[in-house]
């Protein structure tokens, strides 16, 4: 071996391999919570970077003598960058970067700078120091391998494949069917590593994209039979109770349920929302869970309006905007509803300008319609108070009945508020992100109260059903130490993390008697619930969700990674808990019927989305959406007409 290395000048290459290998392992241990349970998993975590280090750096050996070391350094840097990008991404999302997420950067990347920067640390220089060491070695030693290195490459390539196959075989013995049944990226990284996961993800992405081309009308039959068999008959007490009313959705950015009725220094953080939760004209759902994947806010929007699950990788908004959809706004067109979305950000963020056309949304009031001055904006766009204030004339200009959606932004990570925007005290839990969360949540609460008052003033309150929901978690698992203090616990366990995925859901309609609803439900359940309240039966539509107010409502809530929660079981990170007690259960104690249901639910939804199957299915009375009918370009007359309407009033 020594002779082989010396003769072929492979010392530089092997140094690069060892540096990348060890650095990657250190990165795993310091940054990722992968749930290592046994010695086999510990060994695999250490070994799995080796095969990919050999494989990718080995391509540098194919270059000619003068370029060889340069190629190895460039590949080493790119792999280091991929590792570091995953580390930064994981610090907030507790997830790993996928190919679709990289594609999302085209629409979102330019506006994510502040959030990404806040996640970086001075010690992160560690992940690039070894690249600098390699550059110095190349300059000082400058002794690349021999000119003809194809034989060396073949040996290195074969070695990397052998290491990978051994790695995979051991992983499969510990986690059978790892590559075929795992929705959870944590498992894939734990057993195979970030670099091998990226290859796996690329293959899955190609496979997903090919499903549309191969699909035909016969594929929709299985899905139709399954979803119609699981249709929930509406509750006669509530069906049609809000018929003819305007619909106003409000996305409550990053709001989690623990904040409701929570106090800081004796002061309620969200006094208006607290009051609303206990109002007799509000349906407040205290066991409602977000089910978002990597698309976060856009996933929540998609589920609310289409009652289908998000993608396993990436955002439906970004990757499937060409699909045929049967969204709530499109369904309500048969009832003469006009639809509009209000958002104090650019049209292209999350590819909304294209997705809304597929959903049949008539108007999109984006940042072009608002006064986006420095005082009114922060981070992702317009602050909530000026956003709602400036939205009112636009809302009043719409013909009624209308279906509208307002997307708030101020309560967004890292939750800092400008001076003068709030006098509410920050928390004192030793974590700036958690501490600031209470201030921005209070600001959001004040903006919602202002919005309700404006609706009453303009006569729209009594004519509308108002649906408000937390779009996704705000505080990630990286802040569990502070969150334990917030909740008065010694520590936050995996079970606790699952419970913290609760987000508030309010359905408020003046004149309609509400109640506190304890049923377990998720994002996909909202569309059928609202449509039934409006008097629209969903039996002919293909929806994953279940009317929460129905007596037949299903209370098993799938998460995108295959975990789930129900009144009986909580499955998180592959472990089962008793939902009522939090006690961990042995798999032998668990009725796996809920597991099977979750797998089937995700499978059916994925078939619809990846195969674009709704193009083959048209319910009676539904007019298929033609995206080319919609144009969200702001014209001068839009502003002048709104101004004229306000003057007339």
Swiss-Prot record:
Record-annotated membrane-spanning stretches: 10-30, 43-63, 70-90, 119-139, 152-172
Residue spans of biased composition, Basic and acidic residues class: 631-649
Annotated membrane topology is: Multi-pass membrane protein
Catalytic site residues?
Answer: 297
Region spans: Disordered: 622-649
Post-translational modification, briefly?
Answer: Proteolytically cleaved.
Membrane topology, Cytoplasmic segments: 1-9, 64-69, 140-151
One cellular component term from this protein's GO annotations in UniProt: extracellular region
Extracellular topological domain ranges are 31-42, 91-118, 173-649
- Highest taxon listed in the record's lineage: Bacteria
- Site, as annotated: Cleavage: 215-216
Q: In which pathway does it act?
A: Cell wall biogenesis; lipoteichoic acid biosynthesis
List of residues binding substrate:
412
The UniProt entry, under InterPro entries, shows:
Alkaline_phosphatase_core_sf, LtaS-like, OpgB/LTA_synthase_biosynth, Sulfatase_N
| Annotated Mn(2+) binding sites | 253, 297, 471-472
EC number assigned by the record: 2.7.8.-
Which key words are in the record?
Cell membrane, Cell wall biogenesis/degradation, Manganese, Membrane, Metal-binding, Secreted, Transferase, Transmembrane, Transmembrane helix
Top EC category = transferase
Kindly list the GO molecular function terms attached to this UniProt entry: metal ion binding; transferase activity
In Gene Ontology terms, what is a biological process of this protein?
Answer: lipoteichoic acid biosynthetic process
Beyond the main fields, what else does the record say?
Answer: Restores staphylococcal growth after ltaS depletion.
| Family of this protein | Belongs to the LTA synthase family.
The protein's job, in short, is: Catalyzes the polymerization of lipoteichoic acid (LTA) polyglycerol phosphate, a reaction that presumably uses phosphatidylglycerol (PG) as substrate.
Q: What is this protein called?
A: Lipoteichoic acid synthase 2
Source organism per UniProt: Bacillus subtilis (strain 168)
């Amino acid at each position: 071996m020594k002779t082989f290395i010396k003769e072929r000048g492979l010392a530089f290459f092997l140094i690069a391999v060892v540096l990348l290998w060890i650095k990657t392992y250190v990165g795993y241990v310091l940054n990722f919570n992968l749930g290592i349970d046994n010695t086999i998993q510990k060994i695999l975590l250490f070994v799995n970077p080796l095969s990919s280090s050999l494989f990718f750096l080995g391509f540098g050996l194919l270059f000619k003598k003068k370029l060889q070391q340069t190629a190895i350094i460039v590949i080493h840097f790119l792999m280091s960058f991929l590792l570091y990008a995953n580390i930064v991404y994981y610090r907030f999302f507790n997830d790993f970067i996928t190919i679709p997420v990289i594609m999302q950067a085209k629409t979102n990347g330019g506006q994510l700078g502040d959030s990404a920067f806040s996640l970086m640390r001075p010690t992160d220089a560690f992940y690039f120091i070894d690249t600098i060491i390699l550059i110095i070695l190349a300059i000082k030693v400058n002794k690349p391998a021999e000119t003809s290195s194809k034989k060396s490459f073949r040996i290195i390539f074969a070695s990397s494949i052998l290491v990978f196959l051994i790695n995979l075989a051991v992983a499969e013995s510990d986690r059978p069917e790892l590559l075929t049944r795992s929705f959870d990226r944590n498992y894939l990284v734990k057993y195979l590593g970030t670099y091998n996961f990226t290859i796996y993800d690329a293959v899955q992405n190609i496979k997903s994209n090919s499903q549309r081309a191969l699909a035909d009308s016969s594929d929709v039959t299985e899905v139709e039979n399954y979803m119609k068999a699981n249709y929930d008959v509406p509750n006669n007490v509530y069906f049609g109770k809000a018929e003819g009313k305007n619909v106003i959705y409000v996305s409550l950015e990053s709001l989690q349920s623990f904040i409701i009725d929570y106090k800081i220094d004796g002061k309620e953080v969200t006094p208006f929302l607290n009051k609303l939760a206990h109002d007799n004209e509000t349906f407040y759902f205290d066991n409602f869970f977000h089910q978002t994947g990597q698309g976060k806010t856009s996933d929540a929007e998609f589920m609310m309006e289409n009652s289908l699950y998000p993608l396993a990788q990436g955002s439906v908004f970004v990757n499937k905007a060409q699909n045929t959809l049967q969204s709530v706004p499109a369904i309500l067109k048969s009832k003469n509803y006009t639809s509009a979305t209000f958002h104090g950000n650019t049209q292209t963020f999350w590819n909304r300008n294209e997705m809304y056309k597929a959903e049949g949304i008539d108007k999109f009031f984006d940042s072009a319609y608002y006064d986006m001055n420095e005082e009114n904006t922060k981070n992702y766009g317009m602050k909530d108070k000026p956003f709602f204030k400036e939205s009112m004339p636009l809302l009043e200009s719409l013909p009624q009945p209308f279906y509208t959606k307002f997307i708030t932004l101020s309560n967004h990570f890292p939750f800092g508020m400008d001076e003068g925007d709030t006098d509410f005290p920050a928390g004192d839990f030793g974590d700036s992100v958690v501490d600031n969360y209470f201030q921005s949540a209070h600001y959001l609460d004040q903006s919602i109260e202002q919005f309700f008052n404006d609706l009453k003033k303009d006569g729209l309150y009594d004519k509308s059903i108002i649906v408000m929901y937390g779009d996704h978690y705000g505080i990630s698992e990286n802040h569990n130490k502070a969150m334990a203090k917030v909740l008065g616990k010694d520590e936050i366990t995996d079970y606790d993390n699952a419970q913290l995925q609760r987000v508030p859901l309010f359905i408020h309609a003046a004149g309609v008697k509400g109640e506190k609803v304890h049923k377990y439900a998720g994002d996909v359940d909202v569309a059928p619930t609202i449509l039934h309240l409006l008097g629209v039966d969903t039996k002919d539509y293909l929806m994953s969700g279940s009317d929460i107010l129905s007596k037949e409502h299903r209370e098993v809530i799938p998460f995108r990674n295959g975990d789930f929660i129900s009144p009986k079981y909580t499955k998180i990170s592959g472990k089962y808990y008793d939902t009522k007690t939090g006690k961990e259960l042995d798999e032998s104690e668990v009725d796996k019927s809920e597991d099977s249901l979750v797998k089937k639910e995700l499978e059916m939804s994925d078939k619809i989305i990846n195969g674009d199957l709704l193009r083959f299915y048209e319910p009676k009375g539904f007019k298929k959406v033609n995206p080319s009918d919609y144009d969200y370009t702001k014209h001068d007359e839009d502003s002048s007409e709104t101004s004229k309407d306000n003057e007339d009033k």
